[in-house]
Amino acid sequence: MITTTKNNTKCIFAHGGMSISSNGYTKPCCQIKKGEGEKPHWSEDHKESQWWKSLRDNLDNGIKDPRCVKCWDLEASGIQSMRLGGNEFQEEDKVNIHPWSYVDLKLGSKCNLMCSMCKSPSSSLIAKEMYDNMDEQWPGELEEGMFPAHHEKFKKQARKYYELGGFTEKKQWYEDPAFYDKLKSNAEHIRTLKFTGGEPTVIPQVHEVMDWMVKSGHAKHIHIRITTNGTNKSLKLWEDMLNFRSSQIRMLSLIHI
């Protein structure tokens, strides 16, 4: 067990966390910032990448890595951070030191809503709206802001997220059988499996992964967590969740639509 306190910088998620963004790149958790360098793609051995090694080495040796600024800021304000919450997660067998023990999957951006709190990397419908109206201004989609000088950069980004949403014939990473082979080969080590999106209930691969985990027997040692907008009812997916070690449904507020 890796014990985290306010007096150290250790983090279990730097060792056992695997959060895969909608674009297929990996990081230890959903809170971390990109920082310098390139995050490893799911197809790489993430734990051997320089990006991940430097993060792990810093946190293990008392250095507050700037990529973890969200946790540092929360802790400075006296608020429980995800890092500190790792102690409880370990006690409840929801994460351990194995690199695939805590898995957070965003299998693309397919969604059935366009909530105002969301952006194109996480909602295929927003991505389509932007792609269909690229001559409009879309503030906040680029760090520099949406100005004419950056229009070409914006168009490139809009096209990328339009493709990610599945609106073209181009094969996306979450459709690659090799990814699911890798996930299944590590299933015995998974203790938490979390799905966000997009909207997980409209993503076919989410249903397929959960069904496989149940049929293979791995669901018995996995805590399942899903973040949903709650618009889809009477799904086999909800019944499948009952076969996992524990289940948690996080409902997003629709007042922000």
Q: What would you call each of these model-derived segments?
A:
Residues 1-89:
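Accessory C-terminal segments flanking Radical SAM cores
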Residues 15, 29-31, 82-83, 115-119, ...:
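A short acidic (Asp/Glu
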Residues 192-194, 223-225, 248-252:
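Structural preference for beta-strand elements that scaffold enzyme active sites
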Residues 77-102, 111-113, 134:
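Recognition helices and adjacent regulatory flanks at domain boundaries
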Residues 108, 125-136, 144, 163-181, ...:
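Canonical radical SAM enzyme core domain
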Residues 255-257:
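Conserved small/polar residues in nucleotide/adenosyl-binding loops
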Residues 27-33, 106-173:
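Canonical Radical SAM [4Fe-4S] cluster-binding loop centered on the CxxxCxxC motif
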Residues 15-23, 95-121, 191-194:
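N-terminal pre-triad scaffold of radical SAM enzymes
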